[in-house]
Amino acid sequence: MNNLIKSKLELLPTSPGCYIHKDKNGTIIYVGKAKNLRNRVRSYFRGSHDTKTEALVSEIVDFEFIVTESNIEALLLEINLIKENKPKYNIMLKDDKSYPFIKITNERYPRLIITRQVKKDGGLYFGPYPDVGAANEIKRLLDRIFPFRKCTNPPSKVCFYYHIGQCMAHTICKKDEAYFKSMAQEVSDFLKGQDNKIIDELKGKMAAAAQTMEFERAAEYRDLIQAIGTLRTKQRVMAKDLQNRDVFGYYVDKGWMCVQVFFVRQGKLIERDVNLFPYFNDPDEDFLTYVGQFYQEKSHLVPNEVLIPQDIDEEAVKALVDSKILKPQRGEKKQLVNLAIKNARVSLEQKFNLLEKSVEKTQGAIENLGRLLQIPTPVRIESFDNSNIMGTSPVSAMVVFVNGKPSKKDYRKYKIKTVVGPDDYASMREVIRRRYGRVQREALTPPDLIVIDGGQGQVNIAKQVIQEELGLDIPIAGLQKNDKHQTHELLFGDPLEVVDLSRNSQEFFLLQRIQDEVHRFAITFHRQLRSKNSFSSQLDGIDGLGPKRKQNLMKHFKSLTKIKEASVDEIVEVGVPRVVAEAVQRKLNPQGEALPQVAEERVDYQTEGNHNKP
């Protein structure tokens, strides 16, 4: 805590208001509210805190405060300040997270559309739906039952949908506006859950079609009835009164909060919203902030009722939401709130379980590996592997794992420069010398452990370079594979010995991931280089074919095989002079296999030119 903060803490009033924490750059990193500014702000700089709060406090170099007349005014101000400044430590709901609605437009001839924007335009909106797929499923069903207008600008002729029975073609039909308004009301009733009338009508039409031997049409009506039944089963009935309501529940544990919102429409649960985030203040107050952001940020229809847990300030929620606010004490509504709370608890428990498994796989694995090898926890592990085929295009690759996870920005590729032929030991010596010679020259942070993809010979080579030539003290281990090319043994120590490592342990799985990753990275680089060298070598020595023209040929034909199959005329089209194109054909088809001069139509199969990209 610096002197500026100390002096400001003495000036804090006991009034309600908002406080604004800033970092060394003057950037707002957290906005909070308090019933008593003095007590709340001082609490950040006194006593111990959990890890996330310690992280926040460590960045605070200044703060400001704004006094308000009431707690509710402070709540509203806090929400606006968060929206305006987007502090990194505050609850932030994504502005672009919106839900789809089905809309009946307020037009002379209404349309049925899906939209994510709710406007005061006289249209009828139904939803929200969990995703656009669910909304489309319902709309497709409605399109089959109700032939609304489909075109934005109706043509003088009938549209495609008219021919498949999904548009009335109002530009030529005799139906008046009242008919379409009546149809809009039927859709409205259907989307409100009042679908029995429509089902009865469809059953009547199905029976009539069957009597007149129109069995295909009768089958269509049957399929529609079944589709409505399927839709009914997907929407769980939550309340008998068929009201539209949002049901809030939350649960807190270990400094984290989960808020669940049930969207109940016409008594049916059609979607839920789940958010998990760390909280820094009183959980009830952070919940209120969440509710304020929820209705402020989202394109969301405010329902008839909002149900909230018992211990939440009802008046504060009323200031945030223009709806009937209830804290149910018993009965069906109380059960809904309890269900939302239960689901919030389950979601939070699942998060912690996943975190524990993640820590076990990463942090726990490196800690166990350090204990097993009797070295400090290997936070940074660098691993090497060589790749070549009969000594051609020899390469090596290094992958880096930090805290048990790949750090791809630190990966490195090496072309072997000093070795002729297939010599894994010499290649390993060169690469280790290049890598750690640079670490030494530039005073880079060395790894906590080097893992060599290889046996005793490669590991000893690495030890010679690291310890004897460069004088560095870095632990080095080796990973040997079995005859099935699977991770088999871990070598470590001086002299090297097989480490007793359980094949079911997380540290074994970590080493396996490292070995698989470095092998993948090395072999991918080798394939890329070999492909490039093969292309270049076969086109080398052709007069008039320089690097630029080679590049243009590869860009156009994608592979050497395609160039070989191309006619002279096709090569000329790429910008290569005819005499050079003929030379290319002679070089690639040396035994009189050159293709005709005139290009013929050919099938352009998908090339494999890019299959080696990582």
Curated annotation (Swiss-Prot):
<dbReference type="GO" id="GO:0009380">
    <property type="term" value="C:excinuclease repair complex"/>
</dbReference>
<dbReference type="InterPro" id="IPR000305">
    <property type="entry name" value="GIY-YIG_endonuc"/>
</dbReference>
<keyword id="KW-0742">SOS response</keyword>
<keyword id="KW-0228">DNA excision</keyword>
<dbReference type="Pfam" id="PF02151">
    <property type="entry name" value="UVR"/>
</dbReference>
<dbReference type="InterPro" id="IPR004791">
    <property type="entry name" value="UvrC"/>
</dbReference>
<dbReference type="InterPro" id="IPR038476">
    <property type="entry name" value="UvrC_RNase_H_dom_sf"/>
</dbReference>
<dbReference type="GO" id="GO:0009381">
    <property type="term" value="F:excinuclease ABC activity"/>
</dbReference>
<dbReference type="InterPro" id="IPR050066">
    <property type="entry name" value="UvrABC_protein_C"/>
</dbReference>
<comment type="similarity">
    <text>Belongs to the UvrC family.</text>
</comment>
<dbReference type="Pfam" id="PF22920">
    <property type="entry name" value="UvrC_RNaseH"/>
</dbReference>
<keyword id="KW-0963">Cytoplasm</keyword>
<dbReference type="InterPro" id="IPR036876">
    <property type="entry name" value="UVR_dom_sf"/>
</dbReference>
<dbReference type="GO" id="GO:0003677">
    <property type="term" value="F:DNA binding"/>
</dbReference>
<keyword id="KW-0267">Excision nuclease</keyword>
<dbReference type="Pfam" id="PF01541">
    <property type="entry name" value="GIY-YIG"/>
</dbReference>
<feature type="domain" description="GIY-YIG">
    <location>
        <begin position="14"/>
        <end position="91"/>
    </location>
</feature>
<dbReference type="InterPro" id="IPR035901">
    <property type="entry name" value="GIY-YIG_endonuc_sf"/>
</dbReference>
<feature type="region of interest" description="Disordered">
    <location>
        <begin position="595"/>
        <end position="614"/>
    </location>
</feature>
<keyword id="KW-0234">DNA repair</keyword>
<dbReference type="InterPro" id="IPR001162">
    <property type="entry name" value="UvrC_RNase_H_dom"/>
</dbReference>
<dbReference type="GO" id="GO:0006289">
    <property type="term" value="P:nucleotide-excision repair"/>
</dbReference>
<feature type="domain" description="UVR">
    <location>
        <begin position="196"/>
        <end position="231"/>
    </location>
</feature>
<dbReference type="InterPro" id="IPR010994">
    <property type="entry name" value="RuvA_2-like"/>
</dbReference>
<dbReference type="Pfam" id="PF08459">
    <property type="entry name" value="UvrC_RNaseH_dom"/>
</dbReference>
<dbReference type="GO" id="GO:0009432">
    <property type="term" value="P:SOS response"/>
</dbReference>
<dbReference type="InterPro" id="IPR001943">
    <property type="entry name" value="UVR_dom"/>
</dbReference>
<dbReference type="GO" id="GO:0005737">
    <property type="term" value="C:cytoplasm"/>
</dbReference>
<protein>
    <recommendedName>
        <fullName>UvrABC system protein C</fullName>
    </recommendedName>
</protein>
<comment type="subunit">
    <text>Interacts with UvrB in an incision complex.</text>
</comment>
<comment type="function">
    <text>The UvrABC repair system catalyzes the recognition and processing of DNA lesions. UvrC both incises the 5' and 3' sides of the lesion. The N-terminal half is responsible for the 3' incision and the C-terminal half is responsible for the 5' incision.</text>
</comment>
<keyword id="KW-0227">DNA damage</keyword>
<dbReference type="InterPro" id="IPR047296">
    <property type="entry name" value="GIY-YIG_UvrC_Cho"/>
</dbReference>
